[in-house]
């Protein structure tokens, strides 16, 4: 099996081979090393991230294991409570999602009945979901004629003498609970179909849930420590045996991983006496150090580990930064060299435990020298980038692309006096992220050539992006930027699917789309009904001039690292959906997807295999490379 995986890894440069590799990753975790000996754990959920960071065909596959757990995710964002909007029809009134729909109904009825309105104003009413308690209140106020009666009871002739009673249709709706509809006209009423929606757009648009990006960038410097975790191979999979820090201590324990981690955490706690947050800086730590520690994280140790964050029971935080994500693909030694520190080799990971134990003294010495070099390089880089990309600071970001683009967006938007805003609450964040689709859409399986947009930056820099806080609208306004909750119906004829949905058997579904994606979908023959939207009245002017100014500064630095950054930005931006500028990303991705679709319109659909927002797979038999295709590069 190991030989098979090693062969697949060396040839994992095409879609078919990568898919075969994924199948094995459902059963095994690959233990690999790069050319500098840094360990890398590859599993089903992180292979795309690994491939975006490095060429996996040159990695050395050391072994396979089933003993190593996956990287533990952050606590999931609470699911947005399902939502039903208010419907005020001539035959009935259905309140919006509420813990107390009966109270909403009596308040609605008070708009027509002055005596109810007067009683509410004079005495008020306690929240309740009990019909008997509502009726008791009505009776005590001399309003028994308006008593609430369930529709089924009324039809049994039990309450026909109460001509002014409030007839309610009672129901239980999945994931919502009890709901009531006030029946205004018995003769014309039929129970309506009510859309149960994943988001309450009116709530999401509230001003207090949005903040200016610039307000989040003014952060003071936090204590920084370089760190590296080293792992050895045993019969039961890899284990951490050494944790090195600089400036700081090195912890070594071959007998108890639990004690190794506890000693490290005790030291962390001791150095946090004067601060509530510190930064640990590693290199490729997201691919080895953190997931390896996560496997053995002790229960009841006073700390929880979630992705790159450690949180103590008293609220202290340790943020574990991966400097590799700010290196533009440089090796550790090249990164240190280009930021002015002496490059030192580091101990190899995934060596035998017996070898590590025998050479522990030299490994400690080698580790400390390597970490000192990393620490000095990081401090120099962070100082340079914080000048270049002011007011952004490295520790506020997980990737250099986010830092660069945030600085440009902030500079351009602040110069216009408008500013870009971001959601400060989980629910609006989830709404924005739901509109970001990075998945491939499969059209048909055939041998294909892969094409990629030549310059994502060229496409996105000439477009407009939202400025200011959003407003709620029922339907978006043509010509304005908005993100809408949509009911989507796919075309009945043969079509290229341009709106991603994970159920091929469903012809109508609800999803979140930008105004740009809505235009693209309508062009492709989809029917779109908007169910509420966040709309922006102002736009940030095109970013091209701001990008050019920043790019000129990068050129002026004339360093390999910054030139690599420039190349990476121009040729291959990899967006993500968990960034302070996710609002920018969602529209940038939509603009790229619209560009891809404009190229697909010039190609016979039978030749299209699959596509994403920046890549297109076209049948190998397709020969008519037109002018539109010249804007893409064949890989």
Swiss-Prot record:
The record's similarity note reads: Belongs to the orthopoxvirus OPG056 family.
Coiled-coil stretches are: none
Q: Give the induction note.
A: Expressed in the early phase of the viral replicative cycle.
- Cell cycle listed as a keyword: no
Among its keywords, does the record have Membrane?
yes
Q: What is the official name of this protein in its record?
A: Protein OPG056
* Organism name: Vaccinia virus (strain Ankara)
* Compartment(s): Virion membrane; Host endosome
Give the taxonomic lineage as stored in the record.
Answer: Viruses, Varidnaviria, Bamfordvirae, Nucleocytoviricota, Pokkesviricetes
The UniProt keyword set, sorted, is:
Early protein, Host endosome, Host-virus interaction, Late protein, Membrane, Microtubular outwards viral transport, Viral release from host cell, Virion, Virulence
Q: Which GO terms describe its biological process?
A: microtubule-dependent intracellular transport of viral material towards cell periphery
Give the signal peptide, or none. none
Q: Which cysteines are joined by disulfide bonds?
A: none
> Which Pfam families does its entry note?
Pox_F12L (PF03337)
- Quaternary structure note: Interacts with protein OPG164. Interacts with protein OPG064.
Give a GO cellular-component term: host cell endosome
Give me the gene this protein comes from: OPG056
The source's domain of life comes to: Viruses
The protein's job, in short, is:
Plays a role in intracellular enveloped virus (IEV) transport to the cell surface through microtubule transport. Together with protein OPG064, forms a complex that interacts with host KLC2 (kinesin light chain isoform 2) to engage the kinesin-1 complex and thereby promote IEV trafficking.
């Amino acid at each position: 099996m190991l030989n098979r995986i090693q062969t697949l890894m060396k040839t994992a440069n095409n879609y078919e081979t990568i898919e075969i590799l994924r199948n094995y990753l459902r059963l095994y975790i690959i233990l690999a090393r790069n050319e500098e000996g840094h360990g890398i754990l590859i599993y089903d959920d992180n292979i795309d991230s690994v491939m975006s960071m490095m060429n996996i065909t040159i990695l050395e596959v050391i072994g396979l294991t089933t003993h190593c757990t996956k990287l533990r995710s952050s606590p999931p964002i609470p699911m947005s409570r399902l939502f039903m909007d208010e419907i005020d029809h001539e035959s009935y009134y259905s309140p919006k999602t509420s813990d107390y729909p009966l109270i909403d109904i009596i308040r609605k009825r008070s708009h027509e009945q002055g005596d109810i309105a007067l009683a509410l104003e004079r005495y008020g009413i306690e929240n309740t979901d009990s019909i008997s308690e509502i009726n008791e209140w009505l009776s005590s106020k001399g309003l028994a004629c308006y008593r609430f009666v369930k529709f089924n009871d009324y039809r049994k002739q039990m309450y026909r003498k109460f001509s002014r009673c409030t007839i309610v249709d009672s129901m239980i709706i999945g994931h919502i609970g009890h709901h009531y509809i006030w029946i205004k006209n018995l003769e014309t009423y039929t129970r309506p179909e009510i859309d149960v929606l994943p988001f309450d757009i009116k709530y999401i648009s509230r001003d207090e849930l949005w903040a200016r990006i610039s307000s989040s960038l003014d952060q003071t410097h936090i204590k920084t420590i370089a760190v590296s975790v080293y792992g050895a191979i045993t019969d039961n999979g890899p284990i951490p045996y050494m944790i090195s820090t600089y400036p700081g201590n090195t912890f070594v324990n071959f007998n108890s991983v639990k004690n190794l981690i506890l000693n490290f955490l005790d030291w962390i706690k001791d150095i946090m006496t004067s601060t509530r947050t510190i930064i640990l800086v590693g290199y490729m730590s997201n691919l080895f150090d953190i997931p390896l520690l996560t496997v053995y994280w002790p229960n009841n140790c006073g700390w929880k580990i979630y992705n790159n964050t450690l949180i103590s029971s008293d609220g202290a935080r340790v943020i574990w930064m991966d400097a590799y994500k700010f290196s533009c693909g440089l090796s550790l030694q090249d990164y240190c060299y280009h930021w002015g520190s002496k490059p030192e080799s580091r101990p190899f990971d995934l060596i035998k435990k017996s070898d590590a134990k025998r050479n522990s003294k030299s490994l400690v010495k080698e580790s400390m020298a390597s970490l000192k070099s990393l620490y000095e390089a990081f401090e120099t880089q962070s100082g340079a980038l914080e000048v270049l990309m002011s007011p952004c600071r490295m520790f506020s970001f997980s990737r250099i692309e986010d830092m660069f683009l945030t600085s440009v967006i902030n500079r351009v938007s602040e110069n216009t006096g408008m500013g870009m805003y971001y959601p400060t609450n989980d629910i609006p964040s989830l709404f924005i992220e739901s509109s970001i689709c990075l998945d491939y859409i499969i059209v048909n399986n055939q041998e294909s050539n892969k094409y990629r947009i030549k310059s994502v930056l060229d496409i996105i820099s000439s477009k407009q992006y939202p400025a200011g806080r959003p407003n709620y609208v029922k339907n978006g306004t043509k010509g304005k930027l908005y993100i809408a909750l949509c009911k989507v119906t796919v075309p009945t004829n043969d079509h290229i699917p341009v709106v991603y949905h994970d159920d091929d058997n469903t012809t109508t579904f609800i999803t979140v789309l930008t105004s740009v994606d809505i235009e693209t979908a309508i062009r492709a023959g989809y029917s779109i009904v908007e169910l509420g939207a966040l709309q922006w009245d102002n736009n940030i002017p095109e970013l091209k001039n701001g990008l050019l100014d920043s790019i000129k500064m990068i050129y002026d630095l004339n360093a390999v690292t910054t030139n690599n950054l420039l190349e990476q930005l121009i040729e291959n931006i990899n967006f993500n959906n968990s960034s302070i500028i996710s609002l920018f990303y969602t529209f940038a991705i939509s603009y790229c997807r619209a560009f891809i679709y404009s190229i697909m319109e010039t190609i016979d659909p039978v030749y299209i295999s699959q596509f994403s927002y920046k890549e297109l797979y076209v049948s190998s038999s397709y020969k008519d490379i037109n002018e539109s295709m010249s804007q893409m590069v064949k890989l």
